[in-house]
């Protein structure tokens, strides 16, 4: 009976460690995904601003180059 308890305790301990490692890996994966999502979010905010600036300055540049203002 004592050896059975010992074996069950060992299995419980190893299972707990395994679950802990899985949780750490899952948290690390979520952090990596969050960084990727932030990069995409920054990119989404940056591109419209860049397009807006280009829309404002492009006609002025074309006007000066062609001298048809």
Swiss-Prot record:
Coiled-coil segments on the chain, per record: none
Signal peptide: 1-22
GO biological process: defense response to bacterium; defense response to fungus; killing of cells of another organism
Tissue expression remark: Expressed by the skin glands.
Cellular location(s): Secreted
Keyword Metal-binding: no
GO terms for cellular component: extracellular region
Residue span(s) of the pro-peptide: 23-43
Record keywords: Amphibian defense peptide, Antibiotic, Antimicrobial, Cleavage on pair of basic residues, Cytolysis, Disulfide bond, Fungicide, Hemolysis, Secreted, Signal
InterPro entries: Antimicrobial_frog_1, Frog_antimicrobial_propeptide
Main location as per UniProt: secreted
Disulfide bridge partners, by residue number: 63-69
The family this protein is said to belong to: Belongs to the frog skin active peptide (FSAP) family. Brevinin subfamily.
Function: Antimicrobial peptide active against a variety of Gram-positive and Gram-negative bacterial strains. Has antifungal activity against C.albicans ATCC 10231 and a slime mold isolate. Has hemolytic activity against human erythrocytes.
Annotated protein name in UniProt: Brevinin-1CG5
């Amino acid at each position: 009976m004592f050896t059975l308890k010992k074996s069950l305790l060992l299995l419980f301990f190893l299972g707990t460690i395994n679950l802990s490692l899985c949780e750490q890996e899952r948290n690390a994966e979520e952090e990596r995904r969050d960084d990727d999502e932030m990069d995409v979010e920054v990119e989404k905010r940056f591109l419209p601003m860049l397009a807006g600036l280009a829309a404002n300055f492009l006609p002025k540049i074309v006007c000066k180059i062609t001298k048809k203002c």
